[in-house]
C-alpha cells in the first residue's frame, strides 16, 4: 500500500488537457492506495464556493467517486485559499489545516502547501498575512461575483509580472524556515509544493524535504510507502 501526494495542478477552463490528465489520474492511479493528499493550488483561481466554471462539476464527480474508495485530504494553496467546507463536502474531501503532521509508515512527517516557507519574498508574505485575516476573507466573500473575478484577474497579472523580476532564491523556500518548522513539529520529513521544483532534499540530522511537482507540462505525483518515496512523472495523453 502507498499514500499519494499531488499539488499545483492549477486547473482552469483554459487548460482542458490538465483537467483530463487529472481525471485519468483519479481513475487509474489510486489502486493499492491508503489516502490521497492534494497540497493546494488544485485550481488556478478560486474566488468562492458559489462561483464555479462548468468544468468544475466533472471534477467534483470524479473526486467524490475517489473519496468513496479512500480518504481524500486537501490543504489550501495560495491560488485556492477560498475553497470552503461547502465545496469540500461536495467532493468528499477533508480540509486540513495549513500545516499538518502525520505518521507516514513510521516516519514523522509535516505537510503543507509551501508558500509560507518562502520567507525571503517579503512583499508576498505581507500580502499573505493580509489575505489570511478572517475579516479580509469575509469581506472578499461578500463582494459581488463580478467584483471578485475582477480582483482575482488583477492579482494574477500582478503576480506574474512581479515574479518575472524576482530572483530564483527569493522565490524558493528559505532553509532556516524549513528547519524551524521541522523542529517545531518534531518531524523528520517535510512534503510540500508551491515552488514547482520537484526534488528530494536530504537535510541535516537525517531529515528530508520532498517537493511535489506541478502539472504544467506533465502530471506529477509523490508515492510514499513502507519501501520509501518516489517522485513519478505522468506524461499527458499516456
From Swiss-Prot:
Q: In which pathway does it act?
A: Glycolipid biosynthesis; lipid IV(A) biosynthesis; lipid IV(A) from (3R)-3-hydroxytetradecanoyl-[acyl-carrier-protein] and UDP-N-acetyl-alpha-D-glucosamine: step 4/6
- Quickly give the catalysed reaction: UDP-2-N,3-O-bis[(3R)-3-hydroxytetradecanoyl]-alpha-D-glucosamine + H2O = 2-N,3-O-bis[(3R)-3-hydroxytetradecanoyl]-alpha-D-glucosaminyl 1-phosphate + UMP + 2 H(+)
Which Gene3D superfamilies does the entry link to? 3.60.21.10
Entry-linked SUPFAM superfamilies:
Metallo-dependent phosphatases (SSF56300)
Q: Which UniProt keywords apply?
A: Cell inner membrane, Cell membrane, Hydrolase, Lipid A biosynthesis, Lipid biosynthesis, Lipid metabolism, Manganese, Membrane, Metal-binding
Q: Which cofactor does it need?
A: Mn(2+)
User: Which Pfam families does the protein's record reference?
Assistant: Metallophos (PF00149)
The UniProt entry's GO CC annotations, sorted and at most eight, read: cytoplasm; extrinsic component of plasma membrane
- Database matches in InterPro entries: Calcineurin-like_PHP_ApaH, LpxH-like, Metallo-depent_PP-like, UDP-diacylglucosamine_Hdrlase
Residues annotated as binding Mn(2+) 1 are: 8, 10, 41, 196
Per the UniProt record, which EC number(s) apply here? 3.6.1.54
Q: Name one GO molecular function term.
A: UDP-2,3-diacylglucosamine hydrolase activity
According to the record, cofactor stoichiometry and binding are noted as: Binds 2 Mn(2+) ions per subunit in a binuclear metal center.
Binding positions for substrate per the UniProt entry: 78-79, 121, 159, 163, 166, 194
**What are the GO BP annotations of this UniProt entry?**
lipid A biosynthetic process
User: Where is the protein situated, by its record's location annotation?
Assistant: Cell inner membrane
Locate the coiled-coil region(s) and give their ranges: none
EC top class, in one word? Answer: hydrolase
Keyword Iron-sulfur found? no
- Indicate where this protein is primarily found: membrane
The role this protein plays is: Hydrolyzes the pyrophosphate bond of UDP-2,3-diacylglucosamine to yield 2,3-diacylglucosamine 1-phosphate (lipid X) and UMP by catalyzing the attack of water at the alpha-P atom. Involved in the biosynthesis of lipid A, a phosphorylated glycolipid that anchors the lipopolysaccharide to the outer membrane of the cell.
Protein family membership: Belongs to the LpxH family.
* Family matches, as NCBIfam families: lipid_A_lpxH, PRK05340.1
The name under which this protein is listed is: UDP-2,3-diacylglucosamine hydrolase
- Which species is listed as the source? Shewanella pealeana (strain ATCC 700345 / ANG-SQ1)
